[in-house]
Design a protein with these regions (language model features):
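Glycine-rich phosphate-binding loops of nucleotide-dependent enzymes
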Residues: 2-183
Length: 183
C-alpha cells in the first residue's frame, strides 16, 4: 500500500438521472503518470463518471479527491483551474476560427490585446513537449478529424491541464488517424 494519497481518487461516487442510475458506488484511484481506460457498453456510465470529474455534473453521493484533498466542481472552469482537462467525443471548436484561435478562445490573459507571436510560441512549446503538431493558422473547417482532435487536446493543455480525460477519443477516427493520434 502506498504511503501517499492517489493523485485522483473517487470514493463511493453515485449519480442518477431520475429513476436511471448512471453510477452506483464507484471507486477509482489513479496515480501520477498512469493511464486508465474505462470500458463498457453504451450507456454504462463512463462519460457520466468523467463528466463529474470534469465539473459538468456533480455527484449525488461520494467524494472526489485530487492529490489527497477533497474537491467539488460546480462547473468545468473549476476543474480546469484544478488542472483537469476533458476532451469530449463531440468537438467544441469554432469552424471559422484557426487552430490557434480555438486553442486560446476563452482563456483569460492579462491586458486587452493578445500578442499573436507570443501565443504561437506558447502553443509551439506545448506541441513540442507532447509531440502534438498542428498548423496554428489552419481553419478548423479545413482540418481532418484527427487534426480537430489534436486542437482539442492542445486547447486543454494550453489551459494548464495536467490530467487529461479523453471521452471516446477514437470514436470518429479512421484507423490511420488513430495511429497518428497515439503515435
Amino acid at each position: 500500500m502506498a504511503d501517499h494519497p492517489a493523485y485522483i481518487e473517487l470514493k463511493g461516487i453515485c449519480k442518477s438521472f431520475g429513476p436511471v442510475v448512471a453510477n452506483h458506488n464507484i471507486n477509482l484511484s489513479v496515480e501520477k503518470g498512469e493511464i486508465h481506460a474505462l470500458l463498457g457498453e453504451n450507456g454504462s456510465g463512463k462519460s457520466t463518471l468523467m463528466n463529474m470529474l470534469s465539473g459538468i455534473y456533480s455527484p449525488d453521493a461520494g467524494e472526489i479527491y485530487l492529490d489527497g484533498k477533497a474537491v467539488s466542481f460546480s462547473e468545468p472552469a473549476e476543474s480546469i483551474k484544478a488542472g483537469i482537462g476533458m476532451v469530449h467525443q463531440h468537438f467544441k471548436l469554432v469552424d471559422v476560427l484557426s487552430a490557434k484561435e480555438n486553442i486560446v478562445a476563452g482563456k483569460e490573459k492579462a491586458g486587452f490585446f493578445i500578442k499573436q507571436k507570443q501565443l504561437t510560441e506558447e502553443i509551439r512549446a506545448i506541441e513540442e513537449k507532447y509531440g502534438l503538431i498542428v498548423d496554428p493558422d489552419k481553419k478548423v473547417y479545413n482540418m481532418s478529424v484527427s487534426e480537430k482532435q489534436t486542437v482539442e487536446i492542445l486547447k486543454v493543455l494550453y489551459r494548464g491541464a495536467n490530467i487529461l480525460i479523453l471521452d471516446e477519443p477514437t470514436a470518429v477516427l479512421t484507423p490511420q488517424e488513430i495511429t497518428k493520434l497515439f503515435d
